[in-house]
Amino acid sequence: MTASIAQQKIRIRLKAFDRRMLDLSCDKIIQTADTTSASAIGPIPLPTKRKIYCVLRSPHVDKDSREHFETRTHRRIIDIYSPSAKTIDALMKLDLPSGVDIEVKL
């Protein structure tokens, strides 16, 4: 089973609203991969998604008075080549902030 895992690639996609929290999570993942002798490539930054919301300021009339809010979703990809079972266990036990969304593909 270890031989089949060693030939695979793990792709980790990270998403967060806060860029600093995302970068800290990427650093933890890369550091964990390096300590278990797996080669990590990344973090590769993907385009930031901007979602703009337009809200009327007044509850009644005044359609001309509007306010804009936006959310920015920052994304990164990390590829881990030649992972061992030890690497996968270390990544599963890794404690990351709750504001970071993680998708793992083998």
UniProtKB/Swiss-Prot annotation:
The keyword rRNA-binding does not apply. GO terms for molecular function: structural constituent of ribosome; tRNA binding. It comes from the Bacteria. Keywords: Ribonucleoprotein, Ribosomal protein. GO terms for cellular component: ribonucleoprotein complex; ribosome. It holds the Pfam family Ribosomal_S10. GO terms for biological process: translation. SUPFAM superfamilies: Ribosomal protein S10 (SSF54999). InterPro entries: Ribosomal_uS10, Ribosomal_uS10_CS, Ribosomal_uS10_dom, Ribosomal_uS10_dom_sf. NCBIfam families: PRK00596.1 (NF001861), rpsJ_bact (TIGR01049). Involved in the binding of tRNA to the ribosomes. PANTHER family: 30S RIBOSOMAL PROTEIN S10 FAMILY MEMBER. Belongs to the universal ribosomal protein uS10 family. Part of the 30S ribosomal subunit. This is Small ribosomal subunit protein uS10.
